[in-house]
Every structure is written in structure tokens, then in C-alpha cells.
Amino acid sequence: MAPSSLLLSVGSLIASSLASATSLQIREQSQSYQLTESWQGESFINDWNFFDRGDPTNGYVTYVNQSVAESSGLVKVTQSGSFYMGVDYESKLNPDGPGRESVRIESKKYYTQGLYVVDIAHMPGSICGTWPAFWSVGANWPHDGEIDIIEGVNKHDANEIVLHTSGSCDVAGSHDMTGSLTSGECGDASGTIGCVVKGTQGSAGDPFNAQGGGVYAIEWTDSFLKIWFFPRNSIPASITAGKPDSSAFGTPMAHLQGTCDFAERFKEQKFILDTTFCGDWAGNVFGESGCPLSDASSPMRSCVDYVAQNPAAFKEAYWEINSIKIYQLGAAPAPATVASPNTASEVHSASELAPATQTEKPTVPTAAETTVVPPASQTSTVAEETPIAPLATAATVTAVNPAPPATQPTAEPATAVTVTDGGDSFRTIFLTSTTTICPEAQSSSSAAAHGGNKNAPVGAVPGQPSGADAVGNPNPSTTTEAVAETETSQPELTAGGISELPKSAPAPTASQPTSEFKPSDVPDVPKPSPEAEHPAPPAAAGSSIINTPSSSAIFGSSTAVGTFTSLARVSRPTGGATFVPTIATATGSPTVGEDGSSGSATASATLTAPTGILFTAGARKLSVGLSGLVGALAVAALA
């Protein structure tokens, strides 16, 4: 096997392996949970709202705002970086006055299905009169649902998981769980009890804190809700590594799944962390929990009296959260970016679109044509020069959205003009021509050029998808072709024909058609389109008219400036561009002028793309001198 074939085979094998590995990686990511949001330390204070209104559960509590909570030390970031949220445990209160100060915070955003990992170092202990909870609720209760992830009252030592929603939502399926399902109907059709799972001992209260806390993991999908509790010394390695794998978590403490449509009954939820006192649940079961009754006939009154008169009992009624992390299937979504009005791209989220970027069709200027007073035959040299100098003569360029101002005339000649709209650059390259006339009869080209219909519009064929535009002329015997050019390409250059020159440029109107051009359609090596080789009849499009006087004749020679227009996508002005020489030869003869003038001449043109900047004084003299010498020899031979 030849060395080149062996290298090709090895390269193909490597490319195939890389492609397979990439596909596998993408497939694994789409099937695994990826971190999308995380709260820890200061972010609980900055990214959550402080609730300071009356308690919806009718508790004996005063929720304070962020300023009071921070100044009184009810919330803070610990030295270890965890978030502390406690209650007032110093003040004795009037049972008939405002309740004990506490904190309730709520996430600023709503969240939907995913995997939620909550690392808790400490939660309120098993204290009479307390009702701590970490839960979520939809915007429209009960229709959007409520999930009580961690909840307990008074001397509780086990978590109680409760779900609430509207209508009927049965989760009484036969699924393995370590907790005990005591009610399988989550909907309000059966009252406000909801579906209840009583967790294992040590999953809340004092036993939870004694083992250094632990981790709760909640997996919420269209068809089920699972909740795991892992004591501090039993946290799965995948959670510790930041790549949780719920399939390896083992049996959950709660597995709620049945005929209930979770996608319909549980909508987007906000998270809430709070500690209240007494209220509808803790107050009404105060005596049943083994707490002291000051009034045997009123558990609620007994609860309020205890909370008001025993501040020190609530020193351990605080939350200490290491972190809350949200994971979702697939890659983390990217934020949507709206491009500025001058660009045609709009970046959307990766989760919304298969392609990361959607490109709209920009509106671009119509093809521009430049006509030059013709000599009978010409030799043209193309050169590009940057930075761009102003035009030597007046030029009007028609563009659409936004319209750039017309270029003002200056005394210095230019070799190129670039009009930029957003990320697309439209460049007009000027051709310096040196002409030698070898007449068979007296030519009247100048008369023909200025005769006839002076206001005839200059035609243009709409832009081609290939990136090259063809420009037509009313005279079928002459053509002008626009050449698409890029910095690294070798464009084919076709010598343009001679057309008559109007005295003034036609004024653009609102009805002028515009061509559509997609930057992605510009090929690396532009090729003339069929329309460029055989121009279509002229269309009423805007054009650029550049009046360019010929240079003085030397030995029967003259110079003129022609142009072609380049449609090339460039990211910034280019300098010192280098082109590979390309030579094209065209022949033609002047036509009979509309004013009756006639004449004939043979013409030959050689169009050369130089390898460097040729518009210098020396280059101009050299070009004219060689052409003049050839012209002199030709005249002598004819004579």
C-alpha cells in the first residue's frame, strides 16, 4: 500500500472514531442530568425574595424583610460558606401581640421538572410550637400544585411528604418506597389533606441534626415524583461528584406514581423556605405531640403561650443550607441573544433550536453598474489598495437599510470603494486601462458615446445566489460583468464592454427591486453564473455612475478607468491583499452610434490581476510606455 493511501486510511479511521465518540458523548449528555442552577451562601440572600406579609397558615409569627433579617442576624453566611436562617430566640412576647420574628424566603423564579439536590447541615429541631418547611407551590393554587418536600411540626423526628393539587390525582400505585403512604389522593376532591408519605425516623428534627444533616434528592417527571433522603455518611458518590445518577440512588423514601397526570396537575413551581409557629397544623395538634397545654380546652392558645414565653427554646430552630442544586436532562440551556439591528442573525437557546444560530435573509443593495467613456480597445490592470482612499470623481451608491451617504468627490484617485452594511462588505474595484488605437477607418467612438438617448437607464440583473452579480447594458453588443472576489480566491475576470455614459445618474425610487443575498451562499472560489455570461435585459435598478476622464494620449494611446463590483463578506478592512495573476482576453468593435456616426476598429484587451499594489507612479508610466511602444509599431506597420 502506498504511503499516501496508508495515511489516508489512518486519517479516516481517526476521524470516524472521533465522530463516534462525539455522538456517544452527546447521547450520554442527553440521557444524564446536567447542572443548570445552584444556590449557596450569599446567593440565598441575593437571589431569593424575603416575604414580610401575614402568614397564610395563620401562625404566631412576624416575617421580617431582608434589611431587618440581616441587621438582627436572622440570616447570614457562616464561616464555612453555608446559609444560616434562624428565628428570634431572645425576646419574651405578649401572646396577644405580634408573633415571634422569623424569616420566609421564596425563589424569584419558577421551576419545572428535573432533579433537585438539597444539602442541609441543620434544620429546626424537634421543638414544640415550630412548623418548619421546605416546599414548592405553583402560581395558581391548588390547580398548579404544591409539593411539601420537607415538613414537620412540634416534636417531629421524621419528615412528612405531602402533595396537593386540584381535581383528582391518584398516586396509590404499588411502588417500592422506604416511607409509608397514608393517603393516595393528592387532589382537593378528597379535601385538603393531600397525598401523604411518612418518612423514616431520623429524616427530620433532632435525629437529623445529630448525624450532621444529609441530602434530599427530588426527581420530578411527567409520570412520577420520587424523593430520597441520604444521611451525611451515605450520600451517593455521583451526587458528591456533581454528576447525579438517579438510577443508582436505590429505593426512594417516597415514590408517588399512579393514574395522576403529573404534567397536568403540577405546573411550574417556586421554592419556599420558612419557619412559622403554631398555625393551622402545629397549633391544632400541639397537645397530641406531647407539648405542654396551658389551656386544655385550646391547643392553639397553649401553643401561642408557649412560643411567646419561652424564647430560649427556639435557639435550635434554624436552617443551615450548604447548597440547593437544580439538574435537568441534557446540556444546560444557553441564554438567548438578540443581534443588533444592523445584523441579520439572531442567536437562540440551544434547547429551542437544532442549530444554535438562525440567520435571516438580509436586504442588500441592488447590483451597481459603472460606465466609462470608451476608447476603441483597452488593456486593463486590476489593483486593490487598503486603506481605502476617497473617490476621484462623484459616485452615487444606492443601498437599502440603512442607506449610506453618497461618496464625495476628492482630488485624489482611488482604487477601491467599500460600502459596508452590518457584516457584509460591497467593494467596487477600479480598472486602469491603457488603450492603443489601430484604426482601419476613422472612428467616431466619442461621438457615439455622447449621442443617442442620454437618459437611458442602466440595467442590472438581480443578485445571484452564488455571490456573483451580472450587470447588463441596453446595447446588446456590449456587456459588463461584476466579479465576485474574496481574499483567497482566484476569480475569473472578464473584460467589460463599452456602454454609453448618461450625463447624470438616474435617481433611485422606492419601487426599485432589490436582490436578496445570503452571506453563507458566497463560495470560496466565485464562478461566473450563466446570467453573467449572457446578461438579461436591463431592469430598473439603482446604479452607481462614475464619470472618469481619460488620461492624455501618448503615441496614439490613452488610459481610462473602468470598474467592477465585488460582493465579498469581510470581517474587517483588509490591507496588503495579494492576488494570483489571472489573465482574460476579450475582443470587440465599436457599434454604430445612435446619432448616425460610424466607424470600425479592432480591439484587444488583456485584463491582468496583479500580485501586489500596482497603482504607483512607476507602474502607470511603465504600463503606458509599453502600450505606447506597441501602438507606435502598429501604426508604422500599417503605414
From Swiss-Prot:
The keyword Ribonucleoprotein does not apply. The keyword S-adenosyl-L-methionine does not apply. Transmembrane segments: none annotated. PROSITE patterns: GH16_2 (PS51762). Residues 1-21 form the signal peptide. It is found in: Cell membrane. Its EC number is 3.2.1.6. Residues 339-348 have a biased composition (Polar residues). InterPro entries: ConA-like_dom_sf, GH16, Glycosyl_Hydrlase_16. It is a lipid-anchor; GPI-anchor. The active site is at residues 146, 151. One of its GO terms (biological process) is cellulose catabolic process. Residues 618-639 form a propeptide. One of its GO terms (molecular function) is endo-1,3(4)-beta-glucanase activity. Residues 362-376, 478-488 have a biased composition (Low complexity). It comes from the Eukaryota. Residues 337-384, 442-545 are annotated as: Disordered. Belongs to the glycosyl hydrolase 16 family. Mixed-linked glucanase involved in the degradation of complex natural cellulosic substrates. This is Probable endo-1,3(4)-beta-glucanase ACLA_073210. It comes from Aspergillus clavatus (strain ATCC 1007 / CBS 513.65 / DSM 816 / NCTC 3887 / NRRL 1 / QM 1276 / 107). The lineage of its organism: Eukaryota, Fungi, Dikarya, Ascomycota, Pezizomycotina.
